[in-house]
Amino acid sequence: MVKVIASSVRKGNVLDVDGKLYVVLTAQNFHPGKGTPVTQVDMRRISDGVKVSERYRTTEQVERAFVEDREHTFLYEDGEGFHFMNPETYDQLVMSTEDIGDLKAYLQEGMAVMLSIHEGLAIAIDLPRHVTLEIVETEPVVKGQTASSSYKPAVLSNGVRTLVPPHIQAGTRVVIATEDGSYVERAKD
């Protein structure tokens, strides 16, 4: 365990609070007009998935757990969970649907991901920044509709809804940001 000041805590860090491990979901520093600056940390307990919100003084010490980030390949999903393999050792790890969360929509078989591993257990996942998906449904272009927003709703092959430029049609492959599901560009393949 490493002691760090609360203001240096970032999303994805693993903290040890009272002997229990928590994954940081969000960490924001606030400087109120009066009083001492504080860091608001929203976390998820790894053991049971309970979400907790804590407020620390920015100079307060918190314990960050030692976590090893290793590249793994996503294999498949079944009733047990999501299966990943270390390409160097061929060891397999399983993560639950709760641990993956909303990111499961962007997982593709054979995709290289970074897993955060603590004492042999995968506790967090980091996907590539962008994935390429196909548009399966979108509205037709209405000519002369320049006064309103220049984006239109579309449904991706993974079922996620996003906004795309008017020139994108169903069947077009596009690059999507995994962080927020937003359109990046048309795929170059």
UniProtKB/Swiss-Prot annotation:
User: In the UniProt record, does the keyword Lyase occur?
Assistant: no
Tell me the InterPro entries matching this sequence: Elong-fact-P_C, NA-bd_OB-fold, Rib_uL2_dom2, Transl_elong_fac_P/YeiP, Transl_elong_KOW-like, Transl_elong_P/YeiP_cen, Transl_elong_P/YeiP_CS, Transl_elongation_fac_P
List localization entries: Cytoplasm
- GO BP of this protein: peptide biosynthetic process
Q: For this UniProt entry, which segments traverse the membrane?
A: none
Alphabetized UniProt keyword annotations: Cytoplasm, Elongation factor, Protein biosynthesis
Main location, first listed in the record = cytoplasm
The disulfide bridges present are: none
Q: Which GO terms describe its molecular function?
A: translation elongation factor activity
Instruction: Tell me which SUPFAM superfamilies the record gives.
Output: Nucleic acid-binding proteins, Translation proteins SH3-like domain
UniProt GO cellular component terms: cytoplasm
Protein family according to the UniProt entry: Belongs to the elongation factor P family.
- Family matches, as HAMAP family: EF_P
What does the record give as the function of this protein?
Answer: Involved in peptide bond synthesis. Stimulates efficient translation and peptide-bond synthesis on native or reconstituted 70S ribosomes in vitro. Probably functions indirectly by altering the affinity of the ribosome for aminoacyl-tRNA, thus increasing their reactivity as acceptors for peptidyl transferase.
Per its record, how is this protein called by name?
A: Elongation factor P
Q: Which organism is it from?
A: Sinorhizobium medicae (strain WSM419) (Ensifer medicae)
Q: Which gene encodes it?
A: efp
